């Protein structure tokens, strides 16, 4: 009798255990993938790369050798940034020094350290190559290392200047937030403002792809599926105002990032497995 009771008890325990195990497995399968941190890291890295270009553009405007626009200054750079120009070196070099303490730019970002910008010719001349190298450089306390090159490819069929931009950078996030690595190959088309001397009427259309690792160590790839629009007017220049991008973290579903329809804000939408999540761009 005791043996039968023990058998019944063990059978019940086995059934309950199997039920619990099955329930746990079901919960694991139903776990919602809603992590947008990787998409935010991607946006931070992309924005940082574009910021390097914007600063090098503005710094060179001060000097006629570069054939940059000269009618408008201090679009991003404020009075705490010092610009020096070396004409004696074989490759002309501009250094933008923000100092050892945070320098607030006109775009609302804090910077310190320096950027070294070397160029082989005038910005508007075909095949001119510009190399931007950060030197103990921080933006909003995130350290940026590596380098970026900008090559003038001349005018396209629409008579717009096109630049090939390659970047290989790392971003060491503030407060021990991890490190983002980023390698990208993109093209930037100057779609508006080339014919004027006003920097804030410039608009750029950007295409291309990137790959790297997020701050939590996960690999990713990203592809621009609809050109990202960079509007350099006041209030717009900090973030992309339009465009679509596919961000695919290793082992997870693709994140579809929509930067909006042209509004000058820091809002974007990330779609994961058909569900939309609103994020604020860093």
For the regions a protein language model found, what residue spans apply to each?
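Low-complexity, intrinsically disordered segments exposed to solvent
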Residues: 25-282
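Bacterial N-terminal signal peptides that target proteins for export
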Residues: 2-10
């Amino acid at each position: 009798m005791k043996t039968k009771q023990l058998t019944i008890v063990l059978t019940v325990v086995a059934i309950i255990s199997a039920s619990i195990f099955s329930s746990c497995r079901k919960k694991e399968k139903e776990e919602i993938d809603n992590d947008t941190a990787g998409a935010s890291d991607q946006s931070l890295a992309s924005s940082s790369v574009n910021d390097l270009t914007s600063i090098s553009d503005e710094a060179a405007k001060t000097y006629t050798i570069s054939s940059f626009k000269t009618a408008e200054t201090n679009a991003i750079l404020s009075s705490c940034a010092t610009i020096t120009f070396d004409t004696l070196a074989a490759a002309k070099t501009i250094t933008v020094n923000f100092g050892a303490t945070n320098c607030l730019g006109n775009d609302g970002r804090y910077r310190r350290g320096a950027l070294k910008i070397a160029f082989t010719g005038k910005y508007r001349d075909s095949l001119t190559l510009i190399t931007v190298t950060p030197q103990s450089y921080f933006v909003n306390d995130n350290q940026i290392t590596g380098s970026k090159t900008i090559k003038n490819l001349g005018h396209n069929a629409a008579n717009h200047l096109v630049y090939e931009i390659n970047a290989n950078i790392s971003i060491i996030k503030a407060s021990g937030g991890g490190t983002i690595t980023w390698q990208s190959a993109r093209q930037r088309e100057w779609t508006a403002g080339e014919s004027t001397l006003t920097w804030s009427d410039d608009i750029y259309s950007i295409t291309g792809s990137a790959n790297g690792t997020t701050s939590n160590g996960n690999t990713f790839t990203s592809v621009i599926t609809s050109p990202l629009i960079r509007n350099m007017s006041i209030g717009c220049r900090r973030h992309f105002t339009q465009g679509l991008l596919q961000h695919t973290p290793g082992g997870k579903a693709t994140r579809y990032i929509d930067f909006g329809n042209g509004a000058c804000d820091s809002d974007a939408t990330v779609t994961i497995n058909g569900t939309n999540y609103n994020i604020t761009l860093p």
